[in-house]
């Protein structure tokens, strides 16, 4: 109860079509560009990071490398290695600090990633308008309803289809400012001043001194277990709790690499409090709860339970009991477990892994066996001209130009009008080639046909001329070097900003009184 003011999020609720339309803008680009620190040297992004298959080991090797300072970023999480110290930094109110201008910049970036091979933008004027104007207005600084009250909520609502990339942008802004300040220590007053410069709140969740020494100590201290001798563990191997997206590191003597285990707090909470079947559409199946138990207990062992003897034994026994129950009732075990990835909240982490077998030393070794990095998702030489134009638009603020939508609408218009011109030309050629079938037809009918042909040809010519003129104007506007000067919103002081849950333009010290009046909770004034 003492932390609900800082932990509560504005969960964004909207009709399904709204979620779908924003997803249609973000997902095609994000899903086809899983480039991250694991497959591109020097890339700080942890997007699509998987700790298994040697993923966490590559991060540990990155930490052990002597070069520093250095940083990684994932949504509202920032990780910095500075002075042999590991810092895990979290945006305290990442969603609340997001502005519409932030989301417009993110949408501008997404739209300008989507180009066809011949250089046409893969969106039209409608999508550009929705992405740049409508979506940010719906998601950021929107209003919520409590009974018959309409209350302003600041920042973006958590749970929208652009939450990740918006938070990723905010974290990147923090890192950019950190680089401009010549990378001060995260626990210094200079680093903390970034909050006031950007209006973005953050806090250091965890710091580990002598991070390289602690990681190296894991090697000689590894205890016999599934991945160190191929036996059931009798004693836990030590871990370093990096808080790397919830993962800690331990060492495997058999594989000779660092392997992931879920942070203790998360692991034991997950063991104590089951979430239930992940895919709610499966809940009506008879026997699904027992199948869920099999998957859940085996998954708990895979994500780190194998390292803790008591938890490992309990999960192993419970999974075995659930299997025997399904077999005794005559339920097709293989049919249930074929959908295991939709049963457990851990499903996405085990890509290409078959969980139908009980966890063994061999299966754990297979899950953690390193695989070569995926090549960058680039199938042809990158044309950096477009990237430079986008970068310039972001730096100068042209992407905020509501009249021109930073040229996105103009480009989309140019594309559609050029298509109109091509169609008009084709129609004119078609009309020009067409002739009456009967050369001896009545002269009146032939004159009517000729008049119709001339009228359509004239229309086609006007459409083509208009399209080319508009295309020329659009391209000139896009190539314009004029800088748009936006009206920046007043940057909120993090110390006196309204509470993001309630808002109402009230200082934070009065927010609890508003909550008490509306909700019967909190501290009265």
UniProtKB/Swiss-Prot annotation:
PROSITE patterns: RDRP_DSRNA_BIR (PS50524). May exist in multiple phosphorylated forms. Its main location: virion. InterPro entries: Avibirnavurs_RdRp_C_sf (IPR046814), Birnavirus_RdRp_C (IPR046750), Birnavirus_RdRp_palm (IPR007100), Birnavirus_RdRp_palm_sf (IPR046812), Birnavirus_RdRp_thumb (IPR046752), Birnavirus_RdRp_thumb_sf (IPR046813), DNA/RNA_pol_sf (IPR043502). GO terms for biological process: viral genome replication. It comes from the Viruses. Residues 72-272 form the RdRp catalytic domain. GO terms for molecular function: GTP binding; RNA-directed RNA polymerase activity. It holds the Pfam family Birna_RdRp_C. It catalyses: RNA(n) + a ribonucleoside 5'-triphosphate = RNA(n+1) + diphosphate. One of its GO terms (cellular component) is virion component. It is found in: Virion. Its EC number is 2.7.7.48. Keywords: Covalent protein-RNA linkage, GTP-binding, Nucleotide-binding, Nucleotidyltransferase, Phosphoprotein, RNA-directed RNA polymerase, Transferase, Viral RNA replication, Virion. RNA-dependent RNA polymerase which is found both free and covalently attached to the genomic RNA. May also contain guanylyl and methyl transferase activities. Interacts with VP3 in the cytoplasm. This is RNA-directed RNA polymerase. It comes from Avian infectious bursal disease virus (strain 52/70).
